[in-house]
């Protein structure tokens, strides 16, 4: 049995995932859980970061096939899980991840129209249905989310998708909440301080329920 806990933050672009990852880490620290790391999917290992660069950088000379995108995401995810997350959990370290498995169901299935059974098969084959202890889904409308990121220095390949694409992704997330356990929905359309407060309340409630 894993000694640490695996926490995941999900949501579309502009939902505040990176900020909330740091917030949850601070909440755990204040609660006395001080051995915590934050990672990002894809990324957080040397090889996974190289794959991440391929995924978010648009190549003017070649279109990335949707199936290629999916397999690259899984290649990076396997590196992250096998080399960082599982070893950390086995040592009693808590891990907070910016994205995980639900992102593939939302982005590649709803966004890219890849059959869901393909993603489920990849997850089963390579990660043995390795699941988080709890997932925070930051729900934001594409209008608000995309407006938040428009002032960034550079919009990456994923962020360049249409509002229609992100509506499909968001709707998939909302459907997943209804069918999968352990997902907490947070209204991320609000100002970040209110989002942080809601996440803190939910995290403390979960810790209390789990007697942690």
Curated annotation (Swiss-Prot):
- Is this entry keyworded Zinc-finger? no
* Keyword field: ATP-binding, Kinase, Nucleotide biosynthesis, Nucleotide-binding, Transferase
InterPro entries membership: P-loop_NTPase, Thymidylate_kin-like_dom, Thymidylate_kin_CS, Thymidylate_kinase
What are its GO cellular component terms? cytosol
Give the catalytic activity: dTMP + ATP = dTDP + ADP
Q: Which GO terms describe its molecular function?
A: ATP binding; dTMP kinase activity
Where along this sequence does the record place binding of ATP? Answer: 11-18
Pfam families under this entry? Thymidylate_kin (PF02223)
Which PANTHER family would you find in this protein's record?
A: THYMIDYLATE KINASE (PTHR10344), UMP-CMP KINASE 2, MITOCHONDRIAL (PTHR10344:SF4)
Summarize the protein's role: Phosphorylation of dTMP to form dTDP in both de novo and salvage pathways of dTTP synthesis.
Family under the similarity heading? Belongs to the thymidylate kinase family.
NCBIfam families, from UniProt? DTMP_kinase
Q: Which HAMAP family match?
A: Thymidylate_kinase
Name under which the protein is recorded: Thymidylate kinase
Which organism does this sequence originate in? Buchnera aphidicola subsp. Baizongia pistaciae (strain Bp)
């Amino acid at each position: 049995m894993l000694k640490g806990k695996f926490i995941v933050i999900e949501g579309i672009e502009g939902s505040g995932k990176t900020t909330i990852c740091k917030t949850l880490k601070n909440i755990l620290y204040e609660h006395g859980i001080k051995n915590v790391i934050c990672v990002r999917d894809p990324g957080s290992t040397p090889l996974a970061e190289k794959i991440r660069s391929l995924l978010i950088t648009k190549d003017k000379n070649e279109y990335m096939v949707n199936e290629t995108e999916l397999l690259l995401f899984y290649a990076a995810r396997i590196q992250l899980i096998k080399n960082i997350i599982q070893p950390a959990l086995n040592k009693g370290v808590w891990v907070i991840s910016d994205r995980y498995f639900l992102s593939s169901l939302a982005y590649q299935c709803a966004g890219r129209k890849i059959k869901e059974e393909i993603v489920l098969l990849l997850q089963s084959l390579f990660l043995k249905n390795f699941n988080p202890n709890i997932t925070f889904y930051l729900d934001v409308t594409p209008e608000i989310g995309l407006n938040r990121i428009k002032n960034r220095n550079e919009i990456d390949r994923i962020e360049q998708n249409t509002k229609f694409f992100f509506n499909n992704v968001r709707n998939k997330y909302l459907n997943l909440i209804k069918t999968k356990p352990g997902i907490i929905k947070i209204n991320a359309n609000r100002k970040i301080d209110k989002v942080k407060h809601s996440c803190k309340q939910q995290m403390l409630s979960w810790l209390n329920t789990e007697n942690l």
